[in-house]
Amino acid sequence: MFRQINQQPMTLVEIAKLNSITNSTALFHLNLLQEGGIIEGRYLPGKKGKAIVYFVNFSGMLFKQANVINNQTKIFEQSVGVGEYLEADLKVAHVASQEKIYTLTNKLFSSDRFKAKLLWTDGGKVSYGFDNSFTFNSDIEEISFSLELCSEARFYRNDWKSDITFAVNNKELCTYTSLGDFGGIRGKLSPDWWGNENTQYGTLVTISITNDGTFLNSQKVSKTTLKDLDLNLGNKILFSIYNKPNAQHYGEFNLFGDCFGNHKQDILLVAKYTEK
């Protein structure tokens, strides 16, 4: 990416398209370059309003030692569909595939759930499993989860807040307040049959955990660090999403897969690590 940006400043969408990766994966790598002071992002006017354009900070660099470090650093990625949960405590649950709606209330583990590209519920808790084999004999530098989500109301309600909490291996990380159940404008990925009166899109949220703490969309929100998560215990990493029963805004939630909303991705785990 550095060489590409050095040749020509680009937006996140342009970088992702050029490298055939998702926007969230591109953003993960761009954030690493920004943290190192190698590139910077500036808001500039474009055809569809302002967008962040990434520029190289220096005209020339020597990377002899950096190349050694970069060769040792590895990236692990895994996507899990919104219906591929391992645990679910949901009183009411619905999912939509690319073709139709399925009601999963009282049958949460029906095979229909694997068709899900959108899940909405009246609250409760849902947990997803990710491979943790990369954590064995490794030093983990950062692990992040990104997903598109919003609140859940009848049809849609743009001002319906919901406090949505995230945990890893049952260790609470942080709570994100969704500002609404968004509709009125069709989602970029909404299937043709999906009614205009329904929820259309969410917000892309990224939760990152490092040795310095937990970050929500790049802002530090918790002192919980990697060592608190026991990532190498058992055979999986359990990522949980839920409304606390005593939440100030118990606004339920929608989880978007790669065929609904505005972001073509499922629930994505990205980890940065080095082998021992």
Residue ranges and their predicted role:
Residues 17, 34-35:
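Alpha-helical residues within the helix-turn-helix
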Residues 107-119, 177-233, 249-251:
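Extended, solvent-exposed segments with strong compositional bias
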